Amino acid sequence: MIAKTVAILALAGSAAAYAPTMSLSANRRELVQGAAAAAVVAPMLRPTGASAKDAQLRAPVVTIFDARGCKDHANKEYTDPKAGNAENDECCVKVQMTPIKVADDAAALVLKECLSELKGKK
């Protein structure tokens, strides 16, 4: 959006800088042309809202698996070479984007509590 705005302003600026003018006074035709150009550029200069919201309301969930000292069975899942350090070989971290679901009644309760705390601080 910013690049588009800069390009339009640069184009308008270069057109204004090299416009052939016979006199310094602006006539009616030039005023109408300037107003038309401003009307075209004005909608492009409006601020736009952020579009970064995740539609599924997902958040990263970190799960830590720690099997240090576990002697119940031999691990057969991992077949690559081991790190050589027993502590690192028996630990795993999993990060997964998971949809977060919040019930409407829970959200209303949190909102009510926050508003009551804000009103109490006056």
Curated annotation (Swiss-Prot):
It is found in: Plastid, Chloroplast thylakoid membrane. (2R,3E)-phycocyanobilin 2 binds at residue 68. The keyword RNA-binding does not apply. Its main location: plastid. Disulfide bonds: none annotated. Transmembrane segments: none annotated. One of its GO terms (cellular component) is phycobilisome. Mesobiliverdin binds at residues 70, 76-77, 92. The keyword Translocase does not apply. InterPro entries: Globular_prot_asu/bsu, Phycoerythr-like_a_sf, Phycoerythr_a. Coiled coil: none annotated. Light-harvesting photosynthetic tetrapyrrole chromophore-protein from the phycobiliprotein complex. The light-harvesting system in Cryptophytes contains phycobiliprotein complexes. Unusually they are composed of either phycoerythrin (CPE) or phycocyanin (CPC) but never allophycocyanin (APC), with only one type of biliprotein being present in any one species. Unlike cyanobacteria or red algae these proteins are not arranged into higher-order phycobilisome complexes, and they are found in the thylakoid lumen. Heterotetramer of 2 different alpha chains and 2 identical beta chains which form 2 alpha-beta heterodimers within the heterotetramer. This is Phycocyanin PC645 alpha-2 subunit. The lineage of its organism: Eukaryota, Cryptophyceae, Pyrenomonadales, Chroomonadaceae, Chroomonas.
